[in-house]
Amino acid sequence: MYLMVLGLLVAVIFLGLEVKGSRSWFEFGPVRFQPAEVSKITTSLLLATVMSQQSFKIDRLKDLMLVALVIGIPMMVILAESETGSALVYAGFIFVLYREGFSGWWLFAIGMAILLFILTLVTSAYTAILVLIGVVFFINALNEGKLNWELGANIAAFLLLCFLPWIMEKAAGPESFLEKVKPLYVLIGIALVSIPFFVIKGYKSHNRFLSLSSLGVVAGIMLVFSTDFIFNNIMQDHQRKRIEVLLGLKEDPAGVGYNVNQSMIAIGSGGVTGKGFLNGTQTTFGFVPEQSTDFIFCTVGEEWGFVGCLVVILLYVFMIWRIIADSERSREAFTRIYGYCVASCIFMHLFINIGMTIGLMPVIGIPLPLLSYGGSSLWAFTVLIFIFIALYRREKKYY
């Protein structure tokens, strides 16, 4: 089943219908079908099958690579369809891995990479690297769990780096070579000279955490310097524009930012209790595009206000909590892992969709589970959830 759906994902790139720059739909007369939605079901089932094997160990490289292939292959194919929203949902499977024993430091590393990427775009490479070094200092201090002269020296060195641009500006005279030296290069030089010292120190003192965090600084610096290349050469033009508008680097209220602006106006105008069913001006008169699909949450906000939005969010939270609670009560590893896959998919859709409608996430086109119009999404989530219900009920019957 997994391979069959994977074949459909590849086929739709060549044979599918292009809708708003994304080639991810098959069209059969009046009916459209999106294989990316069904792929969440097959990926969840195969992931649960692989990870529920008695011989599986999450910290073994061979098993970890197998899991990465199960998740990564459909994710990459969906990205090739220019369906970024659906591909991003697969990143949520990392929560499943975390539940099964995957190190939480990987979650932290992913979050840190996103933060560095944003800081480099919004501020400067110097600020991003400075934040990286500061975070590593702080984490190592917590890991040591005690105050000593080395910690004090590290704090003093970090404060010196914070004021390095100001110090260099004041020290530079009209004929000084400091005028031609950029603080960023000085910071990188200090970091690259210091890192081997900390790696060796960690190795000699059997402090593996110190060595790995020092190497993490190197990886972070490489990411910072790769940001411009990734942003300008790998990302597509519409993706760059959406990120620039989201981060406030550019204003485009009549273009890329139109959907989000109208969505936030609709939600804000709803007030506490909303304008009433079908009484919303922004949605009724069509100011908000895709209001029945990707931006359906703004319809809820305008017609039912803050109270309606809160009720909808709480219903989703209750559903996710109930799936996780039932997964934890399960005696079979397959049911538990599959349940976490279902919860992760729903959470990612909820987080991205609502974040998109209120301007906290870029517009990437992703439906709100069981609420947005669209047969593929509705059927996929229905089957996804009911498979879990069937698995859980079968266990209750036999145990």
Predicted feature residues:
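Membrane-interacting alpha-helical segments
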Residues: 269, 333-340, 392-397
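Hydrophobic alpha-helical transmembrane segments of multi-pass inner membrane proteins, especially
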Residues: 1-254, 298-358, 383, 387
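Long extracytoplasmic/lumenal interhelical loops at the membrane interface
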Residues: 267, 271-304, 334
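Alpha-helical membrane-protein architecture signal
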Residues: 69, 256-260, 273, 289, ...
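Transmembrane alpha-helices of multi-pass inner-membrane enzymes
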Residues: 135-138, 359-396
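Membrane-interface capping segments at transmembrane-helix boundaries
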Residues: 202-206, 391-399
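Transmembrane helix boundary and interhelical junction motifs in multipass membrane proteins
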Residues: 83-88, 274-280, 291-293, 364, ...
